[in-house]
UniProtKB/Swiss-Prot annotation:
Belongs to the STXBP/unc-18/SEC1 family. Involved in the vesicle trafficking. Binds syntaxins. The keyword Protein transport applies. One of its GO terms (biological process) is protein transport. It comes from the Eukaryota. Pfam families: Sec1. Keywords: Protein transport, Transport. The gene is SEC1B. InterPro entries: Sec-1-like_dom1 (IPR043154), Sec-1-like_dom3a (IPR043127), Sec1-like (IPR001619), Sec1-like_dom2 (IPR027482), Sec1-like_sf (IPR036045). Transmembrane segments: none annotated. This is Protein transport Sec1b.
């Protein structure tokens, strides 16, 4: 019985992106059978737990799993029929419950399977190893045991989550003994470490440090969240250096650990890119979108679920584009398609693109069966763009978006918000709450006491809404003197780290082709500074500080001058149209074409939830810096989810540094 890891390093040879490596490890390292020179495929059963099912489904298609010899996929907690003539692969978390269930499967008078190959998603404790070794009946039927060290869900070609959906509540809510928060951080750290293990990366671990850590300062648990998480990740990596074969012994990349307090505005502001607006304005479940399609029998429209992911080339091309740009490109695709296909011209007749309905597009499918897949995809995105643009008009989001961005960049203030709330009656209640929370985060002193209460009354906020606004202070690094206030109630105050009213400054050298595209998340600035070695050490300490030559010598791509460019970068240039009206140089095509990058990877992890805008800038900076920037988080947040979570937070008591054990 051996616990080992194999797998090619992420450096050397053909470049493979984060998601490709994840997929190949699951398919080739775990599922692919050893045929021993025989071409005959031996079918096996695959048994997983609820979490590893998510891991597998996020990276691999069912058809890919079947091609590797898996005939049946089962869940370990459910009752299963015996398959005594078949071998089984277990991909499970190393928990006592899972190990007990696995041993039960393989023992007794009638074991469920002929032989078991067990792959654990993360390191196994010594006690569980001993539990397995003690069961001699099960040991006879075990063909192999291995730690895969792959316990994360790939959400994007450059994004992953650790599946800690409640991390924001667990880390920022009041919990006097902090046991729940510590347990959450330990799980998150272990899963971050498995990402690095999968890619064979050993990082410089940098984190957002707590402010003013000295004996005279009172601090809160939440200020130490990145510090504690960094320490826990470091401990996991130290173990991997000793136990994983070919794991790097010197630093190969950079990891920046942050929490949600780094940017309170990003989860609230209306983002105007296609991806962000889909997750904000449409009723999506993760990447799943449900829409109605015309019935083939002529009856009522049928509901259809589709995934907006990297298998959809149109989605990959448009996701980071401004909604106006995305709409223009869809118009161009349709125009080009119709101009190249006579049958489509007949069906299109004299109708303008904007007048085409889903039914019209369905008629095209019947007229052009050879293009059915392309038309289905195109009609889907035409419908989505139309729905988004209609919602923008109905809810007055353009005016709201302009005010939000003016607030963020210091071009508007409290009086402008009061005027807007007094005169605008079509924006939704949720949008009003988001606007008020942005004001509270940017202009704390103008939101104290009576002024803040009047603004919330003007917006007609409910009691739960007021709680969400008040709880914004929990996401900021609150600094207080040792002497506590003797007042019974607290005023609504927020920590202020800025002397200017603007929460953002316009980025030098970047022009905005599209309106409402000024906003950018703080992560963009941090990653650029990190790549140049300009992050201030006192604010972002490093567990293993690099030598001065690291940034000047080894990362030449990031040191190259970057020319200013607009939102419509060459990535989205309109060229090389194929005969069917699609762009042949799509992002997906380039991503999978095996191109090489010279720069070392940058990992950014935001505990407490990440946003679509933060994922967008990771796509952008990967091209700009010539380094793969990978965003990780405990979960991805859409605005509505963030509002719900903020209503569930409570103010916590302050603690002394003496109470913190790292």
């Amino acid at each position: 019985m051996s616990f080992s890891d194999s797998g090619s390093s992420s450096y050397g040879g053909e470049y493979k992106n984060f998601r490709q490596i994840t997929r190949e490890r699951l398919l080739c390292e775990m599922l692919r059978p050893e045929r021993n020179g025989s071409s005959k495929l031996t079918w096996k059963v695959l048994v997983m737990d609820k979490f590893t099912v998510k891991i597998m489904s996020s990276a691999c298609k069912m058809s890919e799993i079947t091609q590797e010899g898996i005939s049946l996929v089962e869940v370990i907690t459910k009752h299963r029929q015996p398959m005594t003539a078949m071998e089984v692969i277990y991909f499970i978390q190393p928990t006592e419950e899972n190990v007990t269930a696995f041993l039960s499967d393989m023992t007794g008078k009638s074991p469920l399977y002929k032989k078991a190959f067990v792959f654990f998603s993360s390191p196994v404790s010594r006690s569980l190893v001993n539990l397995i070794k003690k069961d001699m009946r099960a040991m006879k039927r075990i063909g192999g045991l291995k730690e895969m060290n792959l316990e994360y869900i790939s959400m994007d070609i450059q994004g992953f989550v650790t599946n800690n959906e409640n991390a924001l509540e667990e880390l920022f809510c009041d919990d006097e003994n902090h046991q729940r928060a510590d347990a959450c951080l330990n799980v998150v750290a272990k899963r971050i470490a498995t990402v690095l293990a999968s890619l064979k990366e050993y990082p410089f671990v940098r984190y957002r440090g707590a402010k003013a850590l000295d004996a005279t300062t009172m601090t809160t648990y939440r200020e130490l969240i990145p510090t504690k998480l960094a320490a826990s990740v470091w401990n996991c990596l130290a173990r991997y250096k000793q136990t994983i074969e070919d794991f790097p012994q010197t630093e190969t990349c950079e990891l920046l650990i942050l929490d949600r307090s780094i940017d309170q505005i990003a989860p609230l502001i209306h983002e105007w890119t296609y991806d962000a607006m889909c997750h904000d304005l449409l009723n999506m479940e993760g990447n799943k979108y449900t829409h109605e399609v015309p019935s083939k029998t002529g009856d009522k429209p049928e509901k259809k679920e589709v995934l907006l992911d990297e298998e959809d080339s149109i989605w990959v091309e448009l996701r980071d584009a401004h909604i106006a740009d995305a709409s223009e490109r869809l118009h161009e695709k349709m125009t080009n398609f119709v101009s190249k296909n006579k049958a489509a011209q007949l069906k299109h007749s004299s109708k303008d693109f904007g007048d085409l309905s889903s039914k019209d597009l369905q008629k095209m499918v019947h007229a052009l069966p050879q293009y059915s897949e392309q038309i289905d995809k195109l009609s889907l995105h035409v419908e989505i763009a139309r729905t988004i643009n209609r919602t923008i008009m109905e809810q007055g989001l353009r005016d709201l978006g302009q005010l939000e961005q003016d607030l963020v960049f210091g071009d508007a203030g409290r009086k402008d918000v009061i005027k807007f709330l007094s005169t605008n009656h079509i924006i939704s209640h949720e949008s009003k709450l988001r606007l008020i929370m942005i004001v509270a985060a940017i202009y704390p002193k103008k939101f104290e006491g009576e002024k803040g209460r009047k603004m919330m009354e003007l917006a007609k906020l409910s009691g739960d809404d007021v709680v969400a606004v008040n709880n914004m202070r929990l996401l900021g690094p609150v600094h207080t003197e040792c002497k506590k206030s003797t007042t019974g109630s607290f005023p609504l105050k927020f920590d202020v780290l800025k002397t200017k009213r603007a929460a953002r400054r316009d980025r030098v050298g970047e022009t905005q082709t599209w309106q409402l595209s000024r906003f950018y998340p703080i992560v963009e600035e941090l990653v650029e500074k990190l790549s140049k070695g300009h992050l201030p050490k006192q604010d972002y300490p490093c567990m293993n500080e690099p030598k001065p030559t690291f940034y000047s010598g080894s990362l030449s791509p990031s040191a190259s001058p970057v020319l200013p460019h607009s939102r419509r970068t060459p990535t989205w240039a309109r060229r090389h149209l194929s005969d069917d009206g699609y762009f042949s140089d799509s992002v997906l095509g380039r991503a999978s074409s095996g191109f090489k990058r010279k720069g070392q990877r940058i990992f950014v992890f935001i505990v407490g939830g990440a946003t679509r805008s933060e994922l967008r800038v990771c796509h952008k900076l990967t091209e700009k810096l010539d380094r793969e920037v990978i965003l990780g988080s405990s979960s991805f947040l859409d605005p509505l989810t963030f509002l719900t979570k903020m209503k569930q937070l409570n103010e916590e008591e302050e603690i002394s540094l003496d109470d913190i054990v790292i």
